[in-house]
Amino acid sequence: MIYLRKANERGHANHGWLDSWHTFSFANYYDPNFMGFSALRVINDDVIEAGQGFGTHPHKDMEILTYVLEGTVEHQDSMGNKEQVPAGEFQIMSAGTGIRHSEYNPSSTERLHLYQIWIMPEENGITPRYEQRRFDAVQGKQLVLSPDARDGSLKVHQDMELYRWALLKDEQSVHQIAAERRVWIQVVKGNVTINGVKASISDGLAIWDEQAISIHADSDSEVLLFDLPPV
């Protein structure tokens, strides 16, 4: 089964300094049909105006991933980290027993565009941590998150994998799905056809009870592929 979550059907909140689209229920957006998918709890597509950002606030027992698409985010947290995360890089934070952090757009002229993704951990009460990394493969399917941090990927405390998959126009490829696993695909750019279903930038696809995904790039495209545990 494939369910297409169209970009314009997501929850939307424009706060002036922040324009945010919510794939799943978040803050004042609530839809009981979209509370998450497997271990995925939040996919927020955020545009933050120059000099603006999220002030210091707490989190607990959540894996929080940021993928910067445009601009740079300045991260500070209660573990003493102060880092700049430029476009193309991923950062992950295990909130675990508790953490406080802020995320700002340090530019005085340029906007910041990012995905903020929350993943429920396999267990609560883990030690907080922070990592960031650039993945340099321009094309193909590259492992970004895994439970064992293999092949240079970032560690995630969950039985899941995240791939960044970049394809040139008319390229076609296949991803096998293990029994009972679930897959979420988020289209970062371009237009793709997945098992016959057409999707475009900012669309999402929930996939279950499928043995494989066949993806065709209708234009130069990039997707995030989440290989998730059974429900």
Curated annotation (Swiss-Prot):
Alphabetical UniProt keywords: Copper, Dioxygenase, Iron, Metal-binding, Oxidoreductase, Zinc
Pathway membership, UniProt: Flavonoid metabolism; quercetin degradation
EC number: 1.13.11.24
Entries under Pfam families matching the protein: Pirin, Pirin_C_2
Binding residue positions for a divalent metal cation: 57, 59, 101, 103
Cofactor binding, per record: Binds 1 divalent metal cation, Zn(2+), Co(2+) or Fe(2+).
Gene3D superfamilies referenced in this protein's UniProt entry, alphabetically: Jelly Rolls
Catalytic activity: quercetin + O2 = 2-(3,4-dihydroxybenzoyloxy)-4,6-dihydroxybenzoate + CO
One MF term in the entry's GO annotations: quercetin 2,3-dioxygenase activity
Enzyme class: oxidoreductase
Keyword set includes Ribonucleoprotein: no
Cofactor(s) this protein requires: Zn(2+); Co(2+); Fe(2+)
Miscellaneous note of the record: Quercetin is a flavonoid compound synthesized by a variety of plants, including foods for human consumption.
Family the UniProt entry places it in: Belongs to the pirin family.
Function text: Has quercetin 2,3-dioxygenase activity in vitro. Its physiological role is unknown; however, may provide a mechanism that would avoid inhibition of key cellular proteins, such as DNA gyrase, by quercetin.
Comment, domains: Is composed of two structurally similar domains arranged face to face.
Protein name: Quercetin 2,3-dioxygenase
